[in-house]
Design a protein with these regions (language model features):
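Aromatic (phenylalanine/tyrosine) cluster motif
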Residues: 7, 20-24
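Catalytic core of pol beta-like nucleotidyltransferases
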Residues: 23-75, 86-92, 108-218, 223-328
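Short, hydrophobic-rich beta-strand element in sensory/regulatory alpha-beta domains
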Residues: 77-81
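Short acidic, glycine/proline-enriched helix-loop-strand junctions
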Residues: 93-99
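Short beta-strand-to-loop capping motifs
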Residues: 101-105
Length: 328
């Protein structure tokens, strides 16, 4: 008889090194086949039957997302929902499904294509929570790296799916937060400084020499540095793109202020990120590159605003790592 395992994240008081454990509830599949998601014997959907607090998300909606991901697109080992929706260390500032999907082999689809798949399968108009912030990582990477991002997801996250062949285990010991803090702080100090220096050079080129080409190029490059800094401080690894449009799409839910600064609402018509991308491509080599000073000034001001937002975000995250290191 096929069975389902429903996972519930509960406090564990008997082991100080393992604050969480997974409670397994075995349910006869014949008694639970009214939900289409439960048709697959490999799926384990978190329906937490014993959670007293009000949920911040709809389990049926989470199950629908998992079903879409596993319906011929991916063969994951497991999928975790982490962050504030499950009462864990906050990740996204916006209300979003922070999901970590771990796969054994590099999949055909990357996170950008997967967002499109989910948009087709679970349209925004049908979602109670609009945003899905999905990370796709290989099992080999997860098993060979210790970062705060991976620790928070695995220690606090809710297991939405686990393959029949994989035995999911939570970390028994915390990572070395002192090392994580030092590493993130070094990256923050190095690349934030470079970003700020580029902003100063951009302002000098704009105000003093009236060189719009250099002002545009330096502003765009500064934004790339700031986004790389933000990604590393939160995730403990380098981001694999220098495209400011892609970088914002990857990190936008980390701060609603960033979303307000750069998201195009089709009312305000905020095109700063595509313009920054074009600055990077055209200002170094395009002989006909030109931009009106008034328009460039608007884009530069948004970059300065984003720099302050990112610096504040990184500062708060670094404080968290430092506080956790002092408790060890």
């Amino acid at each position: 008889m096929l069975t389902k395992l429903l996972f519930s994240l509960l406090p564990k008081t008997c082991d100080k090194d393992s604050p969480y454990y997974v409670k397994f509830l075995t349910i006869n599949q014949m008694e639970t086949n009214q939900n289409p998601v439960q048709e697959n014997s490999a799926q384990r959907i978190a329906l937490e039957l014993e959670q007293p607090a009000e949920r911040l998300y709809d389990p049926a909606e989470a199950a629908r997302i998992v079903q879409c991901l596993t319906d011929g697109y991916f063969d994951p080992e497991y999928i975790l929902l982490f962050g504030k929706l499950v009462g864990g260390t906050p990740h996204s500032d916006a209300m979003a499904y922070d999901l970590l999907m771990v796969v054994r082999e590099t999949p055909e689809y990357d996170w950008i294509q997967t967002k499109r798949i989910l948009r087709y399968k679970v349209p925004y108009s049908c979602r109670k929570i609009t945003y899905i912030n999905l990370y796709i990582m290989t099992l080999s990477y997860v098993e060979s790296n210790s970062t705060p991002f991976l620790f928070f997801a695995h220690a606090e996250g809710e297991l939405l799916y686990c393959s029949d062949s994989y035995h999911f285990q939570r970390p028994k010991h915390p990572i070395d937060f002192a090392k994580a803090y030092a590493d993130a702080k070094f990256h923050f100090d190095t690349f934030r400084t470079q970003g700020n220096e580029l902003l100063e050079q951009a302002q000098d080129a704009f105000s003093e020499s009236r060189n719009m080409r250099l002002a545009a190029q330096f502003s765009a490059q500064a934004m790339v540095y700031f986004y790389h800094t933000l990604y590393y401080v939160y995730h403990g690894l380098e981001f694999d793109s220098h495209d400011p449009v892609i970088m914002h799409d990857r990190m936008r839910t980390l701060s609603t202020k960033l979303m307000l600064a750069f998201d195009d609402t089709h009312i305000e018509n905020i095109f700063t990120l595509p313009r920054l991308k074009s600055f990077l491509q055209k200002s170094p080599y395009g002989i006909r590159f030109d931009i009106a000073p008034q328009k460039l000034d608007i884009h530069m001001e948004r970059v300065r605003k984003a720099a302050g937002i990112i610096e504040n975000l990184c500062g708060l995250r670094l404080e968290l790592y430092k506080e956790l290191s002092e408790r060890q």
